[in-house]
Amino acid sequence: LWQPKAKDMNVFKNLTFKDDFIVGNNNIGYDRWFASKKNFQKSNEYCTVRKIIKRYYKKFKNFSFFQNFKNRLEIKKQKRIIQQNIQDLFEFPSKCFDDVLEKKDFLLVGHFAYFDKGVCRYISNATQGKSVLVVSTTPWLKKEFVQNKLKIPSIIVPKATFNRGYDGNVDLNLTESEKYILERNPRLKEISLRMKLQYKDMGKNYPDKMVVFLFQYFDILLKKTSPKKVFIWNKFNATHEIFYLVCLKSNIQCIFMEFGVIPGTFNFDLQGQMGESWIANHTSDFNKLEIDLGELENAKKVLEYICKEKLCRNLQPRNNLIDDIKRKIKKDRPTIVYFGQNDFEAGMIPYNQHVVKYHSPWSIDSNDACRVLSEICIKNDWNFIYKPHPNLEWLEEKKSEIIDARGVDIHELIDLADVAVTILSQSSYEALMRGKPVVMLGYTHLKHKNCTYEAFAKDDVEQILDKAIKDGFTEEMRKNFHSHIARLLKYYLYDDYVARKFKYGKKIEDFQNEFLN
């Protein structure tokens, strides 16, 4: 009774002293006891619970504080270790070569083991019996995986300019020797700038240190292997461009590989890709290459087959987004569809005189051209649809007049267009195949092939767009396009040997004779 609990007190509260087991006449004493204990017990019980909660909360808080503090210290420690490891890796590239590398006739450089699309099988078949080494720019893939896929001896580059190929948010220090190398190689500084713009999570000095590391790493690799030729997949990736610079320094011939301009093919070029290719820079010579009527008819059949099967270099989404776009456009007005490209992987960034000469004469990137085109379309009350490259960000300023076509099937968009426009996107070929007029703002294999409209000066864009709307895809353009495709298939594009009903392009034996002998 000295420390009663509330539930006990409530039992006593309802009892009388006349009940069983309660005897005597001390009723007044019990009432006094109950009254004295009642309020005190409630307060005491509340205070006790509160004290317990406070005590355990304090313990939890202290534990949480110290645990967080401990975790932060551990993270800092781990970050310092990672930072030091990367610093050591970048400063001692010679330590990256565990294998004893032998001399090779050919090096194949790229990340094709990751995306493949028939590239690995083609390379494996084409290089059988040859002295070849694959330099895989896929740090996140195991060497065994790459070798099993290609059936060719391989090494994995420790770091590369792809997502998952580098370390994010790691600050590094530049050594004096690294600063000296950068000063002596302006092109390396430009590549570093591109990396900073493309990969926003690269830490302080990381891009500078990485380009110097790759430059030295590839230099050591070439000295160890002494190849006669190097095949580079997609020259415009930063890692691959550094490899090309080292090849130039070492006087080693490079052949640039990429998917062909029409689906189902590859192309190999000794001079470069897109606006840097032989076809773009020797237009008159290319246009004079002989083709006969049979080759012309074959080109038409190839185009019909591609359109019928809806073949595309990239898998297209299946959805109903095109219906939303149809609802947004004004039915009685012309529709301009503008296709962006991956500016970072198309040789456009950083924008400089080289880009002006070989890629984009007036537009600094996809969004820059979009702003110019949208203003023209708003002024003329034309529908304007923009499909940016999936890897690029949308415009910072969102104009309601710009119809967003992200995630829409490219073929459905082209069918909706009166005119297709692009700087460098291969959608230009897709549009021409489907009989749509194309306005080119930049230089590709289509440069001066007389099958597109060319707006290579900013002041001419509006006038040329208007002409394309009025004149459309003329019969002369159609004939020139068929001739262009016939020449590509005869002299430039190689069958990728992926299973399909209709085969076209040069044979794998042609590739072996022209590039491996």
Language-model segments: residues:
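Glycosyltransferase-associated regions of secretory-pathway enzymes
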Residues: 2-55
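Conserved N-terminal ligand/cofactor-binding loop architecture of enzyme catalytic domains
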Residues: 51-95, 99-105, 111-114, 122-213, ...
